[in-house]
């Protein structure tokens, strides 16, 4: 561990400065002294100070060379010449070629999926490709299918946003008006049938939305995926590629997956094998759990730069319309005539409030009734059960919006839990 009160780092062309922060109260300040540099595709402004805190894993890259001033406590800090950024910018150039053709012929722009096992830098590559697209005047859509470590909405959901400007260096992309669908589990294995149904619905709605704006239509979609790439996880990748009509699949750091996709996807789909960055860090189960918790906490409370002040209010059991998607599995022989066991996986069932509901995150659906297409309806937001009072027949909810719940509010159960100990 080194404490750095201020040091200039001189980077040659095509190199990057990497550092990690693991200490809870540590703070690192970075500024660009001279030259040109970028963080995951976002250009750094000269002399502006950028602040990074605990959990930050940063790689600042320069094409032409630069000097960076860095101060603060870091667990690791070094300069590397071994970087895949040139291959990544070549991927952007290929996508840009597709976009120019799409613009000329008034067609859909490229739909590119980024796939690979856990901890290879999938979301980082998505961020780089999106930033480069925006910097040349495009307006792509970003679809995040990673229900375990999503970067748009909280875990347990899939989401899409329109990218109109480069990501903020410290905070990432603006999460304005996301299209969010509820899944309710931390992995597609929680309910494979439901996961495919939700991905298909979001793909359908997203592709339709491309027609409403010519610039977005030709800009296309960048898709982030889960790190589960074997067995059923691989089947989910194939399903997503088909649902979105992917024309390019970027495979990070796994030749086996690359060769399987070459074999199984239609011939017109470009499958490209890419190296992962040496700066990618493997995360333990505990770190993943902490990251999920942090995303939920930020949803309700914001961060130090932009704090939110959520509301707590009581809802009586009789006013709570709470449901879960997916009934307990039954053998085909026990199912009604014409139904299969997998139909149970997408069944909407009522949930009776019990003390077991405490700390669970609930999604507020735009559906007004269980007679509606609940699975195919996006969600307005989330709340969390902080208290269950069986005596008073009421629950206490933590919500970004004040009471009451909207009329006919339909809440959907999630296996995700959040301990609200914010002070």
Curated annotation (Swiss-Prot):
Give GO cellular component annotations, separated by semicolons. Answer: mRNA cleavage factor complex; tRNA-intron endonuclease complex
Question: What are the protein's GO molecular function terms?
Answer: ATP binding; polynucleotide 5'-hydroxyl-kinase activity
- Judging by the UniProt lineage, the source's domain of life is Eukaryota
Keywords, ordered alphabetically: ATP-binding, mRNA processing, Nucleotide-binding, Nucleus
Pfam families assigned to the protein according to its UniProt record, in alphabetical order:
Clp1, CLP1_N, CLP1_P
Q: Indicate whether ATP-binding appears among the record's keywords.
A: yes
Question: What are the recorded Gene Ontology BP terms?
Answer: mRNA 3'-end processing; tRNA splicing, via endonucleolytic cleavage and ligation
- Name its cellular compartments: Nucleus
Residues bound to ATP are: 16, 57, 119-124
The reply on keyword Nucleus is: yes
Primary subcellular site in the record, as a coarse category? nucleus
Which protein family is named in the record? Answer: Belongs to the Clp1 family. Clp1 subfamily.
Role summary: Required for endonucleolytic cleavage during polyadenylation-dependent pre-mRNA 3'-end formation.
Its recorded name reads Protein CLP1 homolog
Q: Which organism is it from?
A: Drosophila simulans (Fruit fly)
């Amino acid at each position: 561990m080194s404490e750095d009160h201020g040091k200039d780092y001189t980077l040659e062309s095509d190199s990057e400065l990497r550092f990690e922060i693991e200490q809870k109260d540590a703070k690192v300040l970075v500024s660009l002294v001279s030259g040109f540099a970028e963080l995951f595709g976002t250009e750094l402004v000269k002399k502006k100070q950028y602040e990074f805190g605990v959990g930050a894993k940063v790689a600042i890259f320069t094409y032409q060379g630069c000097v960076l001033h860095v101060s603060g406590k870091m667990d690791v800090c070094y300069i590397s010449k071994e970087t895949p950024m040139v291959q990544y910018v070549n991927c952007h150039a290929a996508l840009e070629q597709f976009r120019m053709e799409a613009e000329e012929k008034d067609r859909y722009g490229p739909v590119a999926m980024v796939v690979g096992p856990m901890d290879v830098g999938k979301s980082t590559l998505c961020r780089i490709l999106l930033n480069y697209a925006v910097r040349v005047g495009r307006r792509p859509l970003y679809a995040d299918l990673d229900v375990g470590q999503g970067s748009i909405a909280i875990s347990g959901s899939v989401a899409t946003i329109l990218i109109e400007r480069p990501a903020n260096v410290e905070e990432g992309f603006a999460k304005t008006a996301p299209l969010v669908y509820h899944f309710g589990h931390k992995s597609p294995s929680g309910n494979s049938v439901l996961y495919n149904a939700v991905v298909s619905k979001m793909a359908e709605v997203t592709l339709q939305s491309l027609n409403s704006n010519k610039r977005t239509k030709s800009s296309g979609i960048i898709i982030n995926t889960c790190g589960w790439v074997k067995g059923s996880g691989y089947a989910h990748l194939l399903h997503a590629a088909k649902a979105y009509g992917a024309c390019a699949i970027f495979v990070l750091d796994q030749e086996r997956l690359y060769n399987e996709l070459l074999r199984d996807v239609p011939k017109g789909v470009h499958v490209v094998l890419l190296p992962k960055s040496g700066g990618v860090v493997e995360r333990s189960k505990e770190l993943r759990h902490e990251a999920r918790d942090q995303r939920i906490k930020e949803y309700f409370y914001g961060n130090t730069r932009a704090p939110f002040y959520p509301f707590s209010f009581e809802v009586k059991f009789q006013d709570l319309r709470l449901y879960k998607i997916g009934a307990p599995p039954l053998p085909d022989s026990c199912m009604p005539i014409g139904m299969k066991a997998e139909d149970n996986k997408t069944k909407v069932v009522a949930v009776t409030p019990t003390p077991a509901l405490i700390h669970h995150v609930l999604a507020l659906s735009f559906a007004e009734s269980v007679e509606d297409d609940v699975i195919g309806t996006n969600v307005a937001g989330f709340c969390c059960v902080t208290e269950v009072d069986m005596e008073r027949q009421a629950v206490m909810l933590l919500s970004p919006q004040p009471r009451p719940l909207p009329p006919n509010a339909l809440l959907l159960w999630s296996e995700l839990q959040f301990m609200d100990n914010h002070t």
